[in-house]
Design a protein with these regions (language model features):
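Hydrophobic alpha-helical and helix-loop surface patches within well-folded domains
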Residues: 30, 130, 234, 260-516
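N-terminal, polar/Ser/Thr-rich
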Residues: 30-83, 115, 170-175, 186, ...
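Bacterial N-terminal signal peptides that target proteins for export
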Residues: 2-14
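Surface-exposed beta-strand/loop patches in extracellular or lumenal glycoproteins
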Residues: 85-106, 192-193, 201-208, 469, ...
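Extended, low-hydrophobicity, Ser/Thr/Pro/Gly-biased non-transmembrane segments
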Residues: 48-49, 60-63, 149-252, 278
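A surface-exposed beta-strand-loop module
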Residues: 100, 104-167, 228, 553-565
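Bacterial N-terminal signal peptides
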Residues: 12-24
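Non-catalytic accessory/interaction domains
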Residues: 207, 270, 351, 448-451, ...
């Protein structure tokens, strides 16, 4: 799911707080579109950190297994009502099964019967439920077919959008579309509305004469009815959680594409076909990249993407039938500034086909197994397209946005079962820190083992629901490593290490000492000590080398023999660890790093540090060589993020002005930056 509306409100409030704080770092938000840093997340002053509020939630007790939903719908558009006729097929989990509940809200139940015999059943409607009493006790071997006739007037879950005209004169057809995640499909059809039960589904959707219906699975047939309406029969024969069931109805143009022998479909408004095709054009390539990286082919029989108006999120990974906000897709097909954001949105939702649809979180506390993966896979596709520097830039952006949430809102573990509503969990911790944990896991076990373990995880758990322990097991069995420490500190605990590093070179002995302290404040969920494998890059006039250390204590000292004075010291080469780092270095060393670091993250890191040196009041007496290095990088660096960072550093005019201009730039460039607003 890509929930931009809620995310935007949250981030706006956070930015207002940041701009209000007088000690905000002078580095503007403009540079953080793609090149954000662990160093400059605003940490000098924060509001008191809170916990995410809410009560403890557990998986609901389940007494049955739903096998299939067959849903027949037509619509009373003037009254925004769904007229439904549904058959739910289920089996008891234990003997003596006499009654059960389905989730059902905002609907009038007209009849409940056994569809095989037309036997009328007793039922009542407690709040948000449909409680059904069966005609007798049933055993686990017996399949029960329950027919429910109803009329729903949903307050959520399904939406009726009238025909509108955009500011560009574009006509948007009248539409009906659904949005089930996290628990809202029960507003338009009775169901078990929790992710830990998977069933197949079938829909018969009756539309107006000039409309079509798009849904999950394969289109079996279209029937032309005597009254001029059409009925579209869709069938999804792979089991899936109920929140992934969807429909879209409207007057759409259909574009076709393919990945191997799998149909790929794009549904857009008439008159926007060229724009939509350009926006969606990389979908087959994304399918290829993900299939090859995971060594696991696209797992369904088709993939469709449909744009809708007034969508409450940016995108939603309904199984085989993704729904997108029309503005996100059409803007990406029009302007180059929006292209990266649109591609990230498309790759995010597509990757849910593996992580979220095929393999699904067992409950919402485990939702990072859906959303953290989808956010990580965005970066994996960017890496394939633009190289490892682009991938690391995505990780830096994720870190910055996670730091904003941690510093100005609340801190929580990734796996967390306290909330008011499930959607409360769909935050930067879930998406951004979740992606960063996968990045760190990749660095911990190595690239080959990482992708092999993900393949094994998918093979073992396809068509199932999962918990973090299933992922941990897949990695331990694949790599032979014990990884409980990793998951404990990064997934089940909260926060991140805050490191203070000081270096001292001893010319008499040609040795370098690094003093490392973990300074984070421990609490009930934040560890006092993180276990951190770290790479140290050391460069002298005679050459360079990489040292491997492991931090396991609050304070440690490391000594390295050198042949001469260090020209460059990189702590955590390649930015493999989520952290905040306090490591002051002289301007000459940073200027060397800006000019010579092999990876873009090292050059960005140096540019950020130099930016703070030349911003008032630190700018007094600044070495002209620093200005020269920044000017060279702003023009000549091969990576756009480095050029942007260096150029922005040269524009520093002071805290107040930089903060104000930076926030304005952040909003005007949010699409090009593909930030948190784009990927929820």
């Amino acid at each position: 799911m890509n929930s931009r509306t809620i995310a935007r409100r949250s981030l706006i409030s956070t930015l207002v707080l940041i701009l209000f704080l007088s000690s905000l770092t002078p580095l503007s938000f403009a540079q953080h579109r793609r090149t954000v840093s662990r160093h400059t997340a605003p940490a000098q002053k924060s509001i008191p950190r809170q916990q995410l509020e809410g009560t403890k939630h557990e998986r609901p007790p389940r007494t049955y297994d739903v096998l299939n939903y067959t849903i027949r719908t037509r619509f009373d558009v003037p009254n925004k009502a769904v007229i439904g006729d549904e058959t739910v097929t289920l089996k008891p989990l234990a003997s003596g099964f006499k009654s059960f509940d389905l989730d059902a809200s905002s609907m009038k139940i007209e009849a409940v019967t056994l569809s095989d015999s037309n036997t009328t059943l007793q039922w009542i409607q407690p709040p948000d439920k449909l409680a059904i009493t069966l005609d007798r006790a049933y055993e686990p071997a017996e399949a029960i077919n329950i027919r429910i006739q109803y009329r729903a007037t949903p307050e959520k879950g399904i939406y009726f959008v009238p025909q509108t005209r955009s500011g560009m004169g574009l006509s948007k057809p009248a539409q009906i579309w659904s949005q089930g995640e996290p628990e809202e499909n029960h507003y338009w059809f009775p169901c078990y509305d929790f992710p830990d039960d998977k069933a197949t589904s079938e829909q018969y959707i009756t539309t107006g004469a000039d409309e079509i219906a798009i849904s999950n699975g394969a289109l079996v047939e279209t029937t032309n009815n005597a009254d001029g309406t059409h009925t579209f029969h869709w069938k999804m024969d792979q089991p899936h959680s109920s929140y992934l069931i969807s429909l879209v109805v409207g007057n759409y143009a259909k574009l076709t594409d393919a990945y191997k022998n799998i149909p790929v479909e794009y549904y857009t408004y008439h008159g926007t076909e060229e724009i939509a095709r350009r926006a969606f054009s990389k979908t087959p390539e994304m399918m290829r990249v993900f299939s090859e990286k995971l060594n696991f082919e696209f797992p369904f029989n088709k993939y469709a993407q449909t744009i809708v108006a007034n969508f409450i999120f940016g995108g939603m990974e309904n199984v085989t039938a993704t729904t997108h906000a029309d503005t996100e897709i059409l803007n990406g097909g029009i302007t180059n500034d929006s292209r990266l954001s649109t591609e990230n949105l498309i790759s995010h939702e597509l990757s849910h086909s593996w992580f979220g649809d095929l393999v699904t979180c067992k409950d919402w506390s485990q939702a990072w197994l859906n959303e953290g993966f989808a956010t990580f896979m965005e970066a994996a596709f960017r890496e394939q397209e633009a190289g490892h520097d682009a991938y690391l830039a995505e990780m830096r952006s994720d870190a910055f946005l996670y730091f904003l949430e941690d510093n100005f809102k609340y801190r929580r573990p990734i796996v967390y079962d306290r909330y008011r509503q499930p959607v409360d969990l769909f935050d930067a911790t879930l998406y951004k820190k979740g992606a960063l944990v996968l990045h760190m896991l990749r660095e911990t076990v190595g690239d080959e083992m990482f992708w092999k373990a993900l393949h094994n995880y998918l093979v073992e758990n396809q068509n199932k629901v999962v918990e973090t322990s299933d992922l941990e097991r897949a990695f331990e069995e694949t790599t032979g490593q014990k990884l409980d420490w990793f998951f404990e500190q990064w997934v089940y605990k909260a926060g991140f290490p805050e490191l203070r590093v000081r270096s001292l070179y001893h010319p008499q002995t040609h040795s370098l000492t690094l003093n490392v302290a973990q300074t984070q404040t421990p609490d009930a969920t934040t560890p006092a000590v993180f276990r951190l494998p770290v790479e140290i890059e050391l460069v002298t006039a005679q050459g360079k080398r990489t040292e491997h250390i492991e931090i396991t204590e609050r304070q440690q000292h490391f000594t390295f023999k050198l042949d001469s004075k260090p020209l460059l010291i990189r702590f955590d080469k390649g930015e493999r660890i989520l952290k905040k780092l306090d490591f002051p270095q002289p301007a000459a060393r940073l200027a060397y790093q800006l000019s010579h670091s092999a990876d873009a993250t090292g050059r960005i890191e140096a540019a950020e540090a130099l930016a703070r040196m030349i911003a008032p009041p630190a700018a007094n007496g600044i070495n002209p060589a620093v200005i020269s290095a920044l000017r060279q990088a702003s023009v000549n660096d091969s990576f756009a993020g480095v050029r942007e960072m260096a150029a922005a550093a040269l524009r520093r005019r002071g805290v107040t002005e930089a903060s104000r201009l930076g926030a304005m730039s952040f909003f005007t460039n949010e699409r090009a930056g593909a930030t948190f607003l784009n990927h929820w």
